[in-house]
Swiss-Prot record:
It holds the Pfam family TsaD. Required for the formation of a threonylcarbamoyl group on adenosine at position 37 (t(6)A37) in tRNAs that read codons beginning with adenine. Is involved in the transfer of the threonylcarbamoyl moiety of threonylcarbamoyl-AMP (TC-AMP) to the N6 group of A37, together with TsaE and TsaB. TsaD likely plays a direct catalytic role in this reaction. The gene is tsaD. It catalyses: L-threonylcarbamoyladenylate + adenosine(37) in tRNA = N(6)-L-threonylcarbamoyladenosine(37) in tRNA + AMP + H(+). This is tRNA N6-adenosine threonylcarbamoyltransferase. It is found in: Cytoplasm. One of its GO terms (cellular component) is cytoplasm. Fe cation binds at residues 117, 121, 305. GO terms for molecular function: iron ion binding; N(6)-L-threonylcarbamoyladenine synthase activity. The lineage of its organism: Bacteria, Pseudomonadati, Pseudomonadota, Alphaproteobacteria, Sphingomonadales.
Length: 350
């Protein structure tokens, strides 16, 4: 048994959790977890304001950790390690969580594990589904990232596709802003889409059918803006048509990845905040079945940013003997596949 404290503060959720990992079997349970959302603070701005986010993390993180430890019925001395997000993300928020983790690790003389936030998402399906084995094909979809990767093990990622412009979650958020649906945009668009006709508005599917492995959503976002300005269609129809077009793009790229991935993939896995979208899950399930695979997706509460996934990634790393020095640096950019070539149009490693 290993008790891991997970700390997450990379964007606009402050989170802490205690994970109980059952040693070499790597089955785990969430002993306690808490999440504080900053939605109300950022809603007037239509998106996340980094300074507001960092201040909010600093205000609530320490008392939250004390509360989570109390919920778990343990003290700092009972922990086996402390895992904190070290990037990528908004650097102010990342540093709040990482510095807090370092201080606790030093005070309690416990190992520190600096976790890549994206690896937290990538490994979270194994927390929800212990039978999931490496290697698997991962679709990682969130507000800042849209990637397809082969996951061969902890720290072993091969990127097959990424976005050349907007991430999928960013496209959802911008569509919500265009339609006046507020923040956070993803859930708002999904709710409104249920009331609309997904075939009502003829929106483009960028790069679909081209054989291009990478994603592009900027043109779709622009088409949504033109549809709104035209005033011909209602917001529900625009939302439904956007969601269907976005899903069609994702299915097209994921199909390409399934056909070009290394042999032996055990499952198609989806993770990240947008993985909570029910329509996307349904489409991916059908795609996985057509390729003789099962779809593995965490429950919605583990799709959005949380500390349980950080604690779990820490548990997986600790089981392999991976720990970090107390002077480990925060990283605003931290690709899972550090050997991946720069992407055309993006200008950076995504």
């Amino acid at each position: 048994m290993a008790l891991i404290l997970g700390i997450e503060s990379s964007c606009d959720e402050t989170a802490a959790a205690v994970i109980d990992s059952n040693g070499a079997s790597l089955e785990a349970r969430i002993v306690a977890q808490r999440i504080a959302s900053q939605d109300e603070a950022h809603r007037p701005y239509g998106g996340v304001v980094p300074e507001i986010a960092a201040r909010a993390h600093a205000e609530v993180l320490s008392p939250m950790i004390a509360a989570v430890l109390a919920d778990a019925g343990i003290g700092l001395d009972d922990l086996d390690a402390i895992a904190a997000t070290a990037g990528p993300g908004l650097i102010g928020g990342v540093m709040v969580g990482l510095v807090t983790g370092k201080a606790l690790a030093m005070a309690a003389d416990k190992p520190l594990i600096a976790v890549n936030h994206l690896e937290g998402h990538a490994l979270s399906p194994r927390l929800a589904e212990p039978s999931l084995q490496y290697p698997y094909l991962l679709l990682l979809v969130s507000g800042g990232h849209c990637q397809i990767l082969e996951v061969a093990g902890v720290g072993q990622f091969r990127r097959l596709a990424t976005t050349i412009d907007d991430a999928l979650g960013e496209a959802f958020d911008k569509t919500a802003k265009i339609l006046g649906l507020g923040y956070p945009g993803g859930p708002a668009v999904e709710r409104m889409a249920r009331e609309g006709n997904p075939k009502a508005v003829p929106l483009p599917r960028p790069l679909v059918g081209s054989g291009e492995p990478h994603f592009s959503f900027a043109g779709l976002k622009s088409a949504v803006m033109r549809a709104k300005d035209a005033g011909v269609h209602g917001d529900a129809d625009i939302a439904a048509s956007f969601q269907q077009a976005a899903i069609d793009c994702v299915i097209d790229r994921t199909r390409i990845a399934l056909e070009t991935a290394s042999p032996g993939m055990t499952a198609l896995v989806v993770a990240g905040g947008v993985a909570a979208n029910a329509a996307l899950r349904g489409a991916l399930e059908g795609l996985a079945e057509s390729h003789g695979l099962s779809l593995v997706a965490p429950p919605p509460k583990l799709c959005t940013d949380n500390a349980a996934m950080i604690g779990w990634a820490g548990a997986e790393r600790l089981a392999l003997g991976y720990v970090d020095p107390l002077d480990v640096a925060a990283r605003p950019r931290w690709p899972l596949d550090e050997n991946a070539a720069p992407v055309r149009g993006a200008g950076v490693k995504a």
